Amino acid sequence: MIPINTLFIAGHAKLPTGMAAKNVYDSLTITAEIDKKYGVILEASCTLATEHGRDYVSSLLRGFSLQDGIEEPIRVLQHHYRGRAANALAAALKDLHLQYEHLKGKT
């Protein structure tokens, strides 16, 4: 059996009212495949309503190491993503980082 060197984690946050995604989801979720050794985000996805938005957020997050903290990915996200879900995305990222820290403490 080949060892899997990644983790799959998720962060959640409430969506603001009036968002298209709010009609489908009550919360916004960011999921990420993380390299176990270095904490690097290899792939990320979120529950924004449009594929374009999901792809854009994924491209912004890819390559950051959660071992370095979550401040820089949040700063980059807030600088480049100007949609109504910006605060929810930042909160979901903080929750994702919290999940990572919790899992890291168990391994």
Feature names for model-found ranges:
Residues 1-12:
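Short, compositionally biased leader-like segments
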